[in-house]
C-alpha cells in the first residue's frame, strides 16, 4: 500500500511532530483516503502509472523508450537511476524482476501502432495463460521505444517460466524475443531461435 501512495521517504535525525509509527501507517493512509473520498487500492496491479520519456542515445536497453505504463513505477525509476535497490530486495524474497524485449521495424507510418497493439495482445496472453494459472509471476507493465518493445514481469518461479515461455513465443516467429534482468548492465538471454537463425549459423 505504501508504494502506491507515498512518493518518497527521508530519514530524520530526531523525532518530529506528527510522526507516524510504521505499524500505524497503513491505517493512517486508509483513513486519509476515506476522509477525502478517494478509492483505496491495496493491490498494486489495480493502479498503473503512465510515463513518457524523450528517447536518449545509450547502449543500455530502455533508453529508447517513448512511453510506457507500470503498476510498480519505483522499479522503473530505479532502473533509469542505475539503482538495484528494489531489484535486490525483490530478489532477496525469491522474486525476479525482468523484462522481455523484442525489436520491431519502425520504418513506415503505423508501424508503432501495429507493434503496440501486438504488445497489448501478448501481455494479455502472458498474464492469462502463463503467469496467473500457476502463480508464476505478475505482469507489471510495458513500454514502447523507437525500435524495441518491452514487457515488464515479476517472476516467482523463473525456471518454470522459462520452460513455458519458449514454446509460447514460437507462435510469433516474426519477432526475436530476449529476456533481461530489470537492471542496467544485465546480459540478454535469447528466448528461442528460429530455423532461419540456425541455418545462418
Regions found by a protein language model. Give the residues of each.
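Terminal low-complexity, intrinsically disordered regions
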Residues: 1-38
Amino acid at each position: 500500500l505504501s508504494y502506491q501512495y507515498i512518493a518518497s521517504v527521508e530519514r530524520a535525525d530526531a523525532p518530529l511532530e506528527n510522526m507516524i509509527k510504521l505499524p500505524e501507517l497503513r491505517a493512517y493512509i486508509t483513513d486519509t483516503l476515506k476522509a477525502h473520498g478517494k478509492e483505496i487500492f491495496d493491490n498494486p496491479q489495480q493502479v498503473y502509472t503512465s510515463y513518457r520519456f524523450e528517447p536518449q542515445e545509450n547502449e543500455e536497453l530502455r533508453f529508447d523508450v517513448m512511453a510506457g505504463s507500470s503498476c510498480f513505477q519505483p522499479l522503473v525509476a530505479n532502473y533509469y537511476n542505475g539503482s538495484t535497490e528494489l531489484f535486490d530486495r525483490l530478489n532477496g524474497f525469491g522474486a525476479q524482476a525482468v523484462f522481455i524485449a523484442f525489436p520491431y521495424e519502425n520504418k513506415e507510418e503505423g508501424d508503432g501502432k501495429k507493434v503496440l497493439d501486438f504488445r497489448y495482445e501478448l501481455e494479455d496472453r502472458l498474464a492469462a495463460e502463463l503467469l496467473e494459472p500457476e502463480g508464476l509471476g505478475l505482469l507489471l507493465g510495458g513500454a514502447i521505444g523507437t525500435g524495441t518493445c518491452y514487457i515488464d514481469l515479476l517472476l516467482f518461479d523463473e525456471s518454470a517460466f522459462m520452460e513455458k515461455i519458449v514454446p509460447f513465443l514460437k507462435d510469433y516467429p516474426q519477432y526475436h524475443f530476449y529476456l533481461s534482468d530489470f537492471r542496467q548492465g544485465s546480459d540478454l538471454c535469447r528466448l528461442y531461435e528460429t530455423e532461419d537463425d540456425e541455418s545462418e549459423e
